C-alpha cells in the first residue's frame, strides 16, 4: 500500500495543527483531552510519514544533481535510499492501518481449566503465571479478581485485570484453547497426557460505556468457601450477581469485604457485557474479521505446549519455537505475540491492497 505525497502532506499539516493547538494553552477540559488523544494517535504515523517524505525528497534532489564531481557520491546515496525506502513505506502503511478502538484499553484475563481434570487446572495456573511474568516485563499491573483453586495449587478458573499501555493490543490474540502435552505430577506410570485450558482476553470498558440498571440485577450474598469446600471466613461476604436481561452470572468471594467483592463482580459483569456487544458488532463485520489471525473464536485450538520435546507451536501461523521453558517464564512469549501481531498486520495490508 503506497501512500501518495499529497497524503503525506495532509498528515504533516494535521499533526502541526494539533501541536499548535496543544501548545497554545487555550484548550480546556474535553477539548484538551480530545486533542491530546488525537495527537497521541497521530504521532507515530506522522513521524514515519515525515521520514518517508524526506527520503522521497532526497531521491528527487539526488537524481536531478548534474555536477559530475558529485555524481558518484550521489549514485551511492541514491542506492542507499532506494534500498531503505520500501521498509520505511511498509512501516508507514502499518502505522496507518485502522486501529481496533479497544487496543489501548486494559483487559480482563480469564483462564479456565478444560479437559484433563487436576492436570488441566495445574496447566491453567502455569498459563496465568506466564502472563503475570510477561505483564511485569511490559510494565503492566495485574490484579487478581477471583480464583477457584484446587488442592494441588491448580486453578479451575482465574480472572484478573491487566492494566497498562497497549494491553489489549498485545494480549487479544491469546484468546482460545491452549493445549499441553506432558507427564502429569499425578501420573505414576510416566505416560504423557494431553490437557487443555481456555483463555479469554476481554477489553475492559469505562463505566460510561456500559450502563447497568439496578432493576436488571439479582444479587445474592453467601458464605465464601475455599478449595475442597472448607469455609475461609465466617461472614456472608461472597457475592453472586445475575444480569437478568442477558442471563450472565458473575461470582466473587476472594475479598473479605462484601462491598469489595460486589465491586469486583460488577467490574467483571461490565466487561463481559461490553464483550458481548463487541462480538455482536463484529459479527456484522464478518468479512473484516476474516483478515484477522485465527477466527477469534475462543473454542479454537490455538497453541500446543509439548513438554517432552520442549516446543511450543502456534497453529494459526504455523510457528514452532523450541524454547518452552523461556516462553512459560515470560520472556519467550514476546516473540510469539510479536509474530502474531506482524501476521495480523500483513493480512490486513493484503486485504486493503486487494
Curated annotation (Swiss-Prot):
Positions of post-translational N5-methylglutamine modification: 230
Role played: Peptide chain release factor 1 directs the termination of translation in response to the peptide chain termination codons UAG and UAA.
InterPro entries listed in its UniProt record: PCRF, Pep_chain_release_fac_I, Pep_chain_release_fac_I_sf, Prokaryotic/Mito_RF, RF-1
SUPFAM superfamilies: Release factor
Electron transport as UniProt keyword: no
Keyword Protein biosynthesis applies: yes
A Pfam family assignment: RF-1
A GO term from the CC aspect: cytoplasm
Ranges that cross the membrane: none
Domain of life: Bacteria
Localization of this protein: Cytoplasm
Molecular-function GO term, any one: translation release factor activity, codon specific
UniProt record similarity statement: Belongs to the prokaryotic/mitochondrial release factor family.
Post-translational modification: Methylated by PrmC. Methylation increases the termination efficiency of RF1.
Record's protein name: Peptide chain release factor 1
Organism: Novosphingobium aromaticivorans (strain ATCC 700278 / DSM 12444 / CCUG 56034 / CIP 105152 / NBRC 16084 / F199)
SMART domains: PCRF (SM00937)
Alphabetically ordered keywords of this record: Cytoplasm, Methylation, Protein biosynthesis
Amino acid at each position: 500500500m503506497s501512500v501518495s505525497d499529497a497524503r503525506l502532506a495532509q498528515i504533516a499539516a494535521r499533526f502541526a495543527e494539533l501541536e499548535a493547538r496543544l501548545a497554545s494553552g487555550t484548550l480546556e477540559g474535553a477539548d484538551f483531552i480530545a486533542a491530546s488523544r488525537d495527537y497521541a494517535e497521530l504521532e507515530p504515523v506522522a513521524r514515519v510519514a515525515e521520514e518517508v517524505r524526506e527520503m522521497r525528497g532526497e531521491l528527487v534532489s539526488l537524481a536531478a544533481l548534474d555536477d559530475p564531481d558529485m555524481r558518484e557520491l550521489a549514485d551511492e546515496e541514491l542506492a542507499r535510499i532506494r534500498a531503505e525506502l520500501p521498509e520505511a513505506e511498509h512501516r508507514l502503511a502499518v502505522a496507518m492501518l485502522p486501529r481496533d478502538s479497544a487496543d489501548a484499553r486494559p483487559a480482563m484475563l480469564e483462564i479456565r481449566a478444560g479437559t484433563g481434570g487436576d492436570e488441566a487446572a495445574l496447566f491453567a495456573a502455569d498459563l496465568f503465571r506466564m502472563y503475570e511474568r510477561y505483564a511485569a516485563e511490559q510494565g503492566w499491573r495485574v490484579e487478581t479478581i477471583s480464583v477457584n483453586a484446587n488442592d494441588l495449587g491448580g486453578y479451575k478458573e482465574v480472572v484478573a485485570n491487566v492494566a497498562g499501555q497497549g494491553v489489549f493490543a498485545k494480549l487479544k490474540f491469546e484468546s482460545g484453547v491452549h493445549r499441553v502435552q506432558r507427564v502429569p505430577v499425578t501420573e505414576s506410570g510416566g505416560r504423557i497426557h494431553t490437557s487443555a485450558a481456555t483463555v479469554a482476553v476481554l477489553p475492559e470498558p469505562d463505566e460510561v460505556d456500559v450502563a447497568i440498571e439496578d432493576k436488571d440485577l439479582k444479587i445474592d450474598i453467601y458464605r465464601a468457601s475455599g478449595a475442597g469446600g472448607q469455609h475461609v471466613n465466617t461472614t456472608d461476604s461472597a457475592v453472586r450477581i445475575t444480569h437478568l436481561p442477558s442471563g450472565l452470572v458473575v461470582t466473587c468471594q476472594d475479598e473479605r469485604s462484601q462491598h469489595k467483592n460486589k465491586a469486583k463482580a460488577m467490574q467483571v459483569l461490565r466487561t463481559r457485557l461490553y464483550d458481548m456487544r463487541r462480538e455482536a458488532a463484529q459479527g456484522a463485520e464478518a468479512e473484516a474479521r476474516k483478515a484477522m489471525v485465527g477466527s477469534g473464536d475462543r473454542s479454537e485450538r490455538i497453541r500446543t505446549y509439548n513438554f517432552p520435546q520442549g516446543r511450543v507451536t502456534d497453529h494459526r501461523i504455523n510457528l514452532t519455537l523450541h524454547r518452552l521453558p523461556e516462553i512459560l517464564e515470560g520472556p519467550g512469549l514476546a516473540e510469539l505475540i510479536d509474530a502474531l501481531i506482524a501476521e495480523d498486520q500483513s493480512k490486513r495490508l493484503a486485504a486493503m491492497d486487494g
